[in-house]
Amino acid sequence: MSIMEYNGGSCVAMAGKNCVAIASDLRLGVQSISLTNNFPKVFAMGDKTYLGLTGLATDVQTLYELFRYKVNLYKFREERQIQPKTFANLVSSTLYEKRFGPYFSFPVVAGVSNDNTPFICGFDSIGCIDFAEDFIVSGTATEQLYGMCESVYEPNLEPDDLFETISQALLNAQDRDCISGWGCVVYVITADKCIKRLVKGRQD
């Protein structure tokens, strides 16, 4: 068993037309034992910048607190919100600092820049950035998510269509992964707002 699969969980981000969406499942478990169905893995790092964390649950919480601290310091120093690409570089350097004893997490960053350009990227556990223009997947349902996203994704989707696409991709992928599931949370980020929706899924 890989330590990355100890708690389970999956995350996906998609880029649309001047918008992005990021979603994660809500399950927290220890292998096949489910503990809760209210453990979201997506966190706000700014008005239009979001972070998804999959992997070992303790490292998910540790990294969230660490990035929250660093982003707050950035706001105090710069007196502005952090941009998605800047935050991605912050994530990369933070993970690389621990390259000899890495965090057991594969983060995903999604956001909309000041010029309304959608931005998504993923990372490995030591901070190598994987930039993408369509979608990024992470977690134990990675293979299933790749198949679903390649089937249903289309470029330049409007926010409502992007929500439907990412929801269907994640719900169908997590149904085929026994340590992800129990519904999902979806954030759709546009230039002027962020919409959060909870999507019900199978509870078995």
Swiss-Prot record:
Which InterPro entries would you find in this protein's record? Ntn_hydrolases_N, Proteasome_beta_3, Proteasome_bsu_CS, Proteasome_sua/b, Proteasome_suB-type
**PANTHER family from the xrefs?**
METALLOPROTEASE TLDD, PROTEASOME SUBUNIT BETA TYPE-3
What is the name of this protein? Probable proteasome subunit beta type-3
Q: Which GO terms describe its cellular component?
A: cytosol; nucleus; proteasome core complex, beta-subunit complex
Major subcellular location class: cytoplasm
Location(s), subcellular: Cytoplasm; Nucleus
Entry similarity comment: Belongs to the peptidase T1B family.
Subunit details for this protein? The 26S proteasome consists of a 20S proteasome core and two 19S regulatory subunits. The 20S proteasome core is composed of 28 subunits that are arranged in four stacked rings, resulting in a barrel-shaped structure. The two end rings are each formed by seven alpha subunits, and the two central rings are each formed by seven beta subunits. The catalytic chamber with the active sites is on the inside of the barrel.
Q: Does the keyword Zinc apply?
A: no
**What are the entry keywords?**
Cytoplasm, Nucleus, Proteasome
**Which Gene Ontology biological process is one annotated for this entry?**
proteasome-mediated ubiquitin-dependent protein catabolic process
